[in-house]
Amino acid sequence: MKHQIDFLELLQIDYEKYPVIAVVGGGGKTSLIYRLTDELIDKGKRVIITTTTHMAGESELPFARGGDAVRVKELLDKERYVIAAEYEEDTGKYASLTEEKLEELRELCDVMLVEADGAKHHPVKVPEKWEPVIPRCADIVISVIGLDCLGQPISQSAYRMERTSEFLRKSLEAPITEEDIVKIATSICGLFKDVEERVYRVYLNKSDILREKEPAEHIVEELERKNTVAAYGSLLDCLLYTSPSPRDISGSR
């Protein structure tokens, strides 16, 4: 399916040079992964989707349980993409493969997309000490933050709310501000945690819920000042802006 918006371009992702992409942070990770998959297929790429934590199961999608290499190859040939993961019957969720299996599967595809964090649909989070679970083979890390957290109390909008409250040095009932989002996105104790020397991008989701674009633009500009490439938009209507120059484009979540 062709799209008016190219998220790969807007997030400045060089998937030829950096083919293993880990996605961390708040709600919207899975939707972003599926959107990137769609774009990559349009470009003729073979894509493996996987997780190092858990990911919502989708029974109608091509799936190779346990990352079985023969099945992965078969589905890549047929569908151009495959979800390779374990499967938990009791939760209905995809579950993680081993690092060794990820390294093996990496050789079978052009691009691997990895959901490497959990947030239980909360728009923002500050990771605990065991989070995120970025695989060793990852080249790029994209952190996702939902702009619907702006102005909302930490207790209502943040996953790991106590950790987020402690990190921001605010009460649980304090609202999340633009400055808080910048801090969370760029701190090594926030979503920049364990990124190390990898390429880093920030995607601010759900801009469609904002009455005005200025808060999102301000966050992106502040991230740019900190040498962080960022874009805001909606996987619903694809209205996006990337630093350093604004781009407003309409399309489809």
Where are these regions (language model features)?
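N-terminal phosphate/diphosphate-binding loop that engages ATP/GTP or pyrophosphate donors
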Residues: 39-85
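Ligand-binding beta-strand-loop-alpha-helix segment within the catalytic cores
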Residues: 74-101, 110
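Single conserved hydrophobic/aromatic residue that forms the stacking wall/gate
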Residues: 241-253
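Canonical P-loop GTPase G-domain recognition
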Residues: 222-240
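Pre-Walker A adenine-sensing motif
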Residues: 3-13
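Walker A (P-loop) phosphate-binding motif
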Residues: 13-40
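General beta-strand structural signal in soluble alpha/beta enzymes
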Residues: 23, 48-51, 83-86, 112-116, ...
